[in-house]
């Protein structure tokens, strides 16, 4: 009593406390960063190594394996995967959430240093690492185009100057430049001319390397001057290399230009990038795992004027893709939804109370509670994102509940003629315990979420804390500011003048009278109600098992990502044509705004595309509908497939795949994996629950297998090293020398001129100079035959791995897909030497599925413990929790009705319902216990009176929560995929719960009271309850 009086009789102090909470919240709001979702990125580091010309198998065994053995010893590694292709190895290290990315980077560098002695010689550089996840979609893509500059020159400018500047911006983790390669001097050898002159390829290589050196020459000085010595020991352009003497044939000088074409070209000619059908250089910018995407994008945009100022006029720099506009639009939609929810909740209060003054009280309590929450969010390091703003939207209905309960009880005393200050004090005292019970039990629901680990726990923690803080502030406001405002703003009414008898009040009285009549009938037919209650319990179990499930709602971010997979024997020229064909098909779609793509590098038969869709307001279809439409057109392209998927704000794992979900096969036997992977992939492709099934196992690439006759080689005076060096010189794009320039270093690349290597007959023109100086044709000591070889070799951990990726057809849930895969694997009878498991998002979904029921049970148990402590009773918490089955039925039926799968967002809705619907029972039980204790009523009389007295606040709080969630259901636009499942779950659960719990709760109350009496008689011990 004294606590409440302290605030009621000191209005200035109470107002200033509320003002302080509001001001702190406003300051916190201005400082909060903006993001699509809470920070849930796993720390990921990518290690890259290269050995030009080495086969995928050689890269896997000689480069990947030594690095993996060293990197695998690092503490906190959650998953390690590697992919080795022609001349390139990439290892992805995914760390635990609690691992600091900078500390992990130091450990990675130490592991690379430790493995250095085990790596093969001839690597052009040491392995490097980047603190970025290559499987993440870029947050921004910049393109460089020019009518006069070559692609190599553009690439050089982009990688040397632009990429370096962008990489220094806070939050940027990696700037990947694609579409070409660095400039280089290319030496294209003529095998016939070399043979005629008696010049070996090694001789050419050594001559070029010897002629292009950079060594210190020293200085000369006398007593007065000092002269630094500088020579023309470096050759920098193709024109300088052409007259280079590489051999003497019968005293005549043989120059490089006599036996080769020497051109200023690029280091790797098998690269191509395009934007909207124009050749382009792409700068794909990815953020650091812990960086904020909006702040990073804003930093890049702020730097663009400076970047454009340093770019020559002949270059055009454009933003091809930016993920921030859809994120900002989504957050704006949530903020509008929040405002609508506040307005609807206040409207509900006004309709019930029909008083401007009375309505003003919760109208003040709601913003104070919500705004004050921003201060706590800032102190906790949170951001303004879809989930935290959704928490505040839902909190609108919660925070007004406390004020409504207090306000309604005070208004009831005022209507009975009590003076305002006395009514405020008496009314607050009566419901103070009720409000505390409601708030503490609601916060208790979220305690298991705060203890939940992994990605789901990290994702939901921000939602749970934000909502709990809002409820906590609301509790304080409802017991301090609300009664003070009631005492000083409201007026007493004459006992017989009941304003509720007009308009909505008359309807409410009629409803209350009808409820009283029906409740009497129900209390006389408790067995029927008991059957209904048990039926809802059983229906919950059946619906939960039957409803389709997924991990997270499929988002429409306005960005699509596509992976091209062509025939494994395709040439680069043909692959570039496929890229152009696919880009034309997509560019012609009316919903597409921009298309960029690239192909080449170490994987000639693959490519990537990034598609920016028009804003949601300018197109009718969702991203998935656009993918379905494009899939039909893209399937008509022969010799290659383009797999499209919508970019999501959450992507789990560092494994790159051509679809949203992955199933990984592991084996210690590469042969077993290659035998079973095609069988499994074929079986999964036939499943109607899967779409776009593809695999990263590519072991049917065309290979020419050369078989040396070692006896003949020995007789001819040729060793294997000389033969292998010949092949590397001729066909490996061998980097034989380095050109040093002020801004960068460039390579001299040697190979047989492509004009002379169009087919296998090029091998017949190859020759080796033996120990006697004679030219011996390759065909004299080697035979060749066509064979199949892998284009890539993949590992997970230290096991051979193959990942089958898949998308979901429209109308199929992830649970249906995973069940179909598990069933198919069982039917195939896969041997134990081949192990299968889900990866990435599908793996997290499986883990979440296993913990969902445990989480719900833990939440219910926590609420039971809190209520048991508050009521000092084992029984009354069970009565209160009896409201949950009906809410669960309503939520699951609503999801089925709207064809929405049960996702992590729907799970949040179920958790919220556990906290919401028990409020009705708390209000009933509190008043029933008080009536029994002070009024001497029987349990039946007490619960009946409690139901009638609390009918109005129950209706008000339920409708407030319902209207607070309704905008989430009706909202459209960006981000609605996240909001709607939460709103559907809450609205469905509230409607069903309100219909049933008004009757089941009093019946359960009486059932447990009778049970308590029977138990008391048997034990002859009094049960003390408050």
Swiss-Prot record:
Keywords: Cell inner membrane, Cell membrane, Membrane, Transmembrane, Transmembrane helix, Transport. It is a multi-pass membrane protein. It is found in: Cell inner membrane. Its main location: membrane. GO terms for molecular function: xenobiotic transmembrane transporter activity. InterPro entries: AcrB_DN_DC_subdom (IPR027463), Acrflvin-R (IPR001036), Multidrug-R_MdtC (IPR023931). One of its GO terms (cellular component) is plasma membrane. The chain crosses the membrane at residues 15-35, 333-353, 360-380, 387-407, 431-451, 463-483, 528-548, 853-873, 897-917, 953-973, 984-1004. It comes from the Bacteria. Part of a tripartite efflux system composed of MdtA, MdtB and MdtC. MdtC forms a heteromultimer with MdtB. Belongs to the resistance-nodulation-cell division (RND) (TC 2.A.6) family. MdtC subfamily. This is Multidrug resistance protein MdtC. It comes from Salmonella choleraesuis (strain SC-B67).
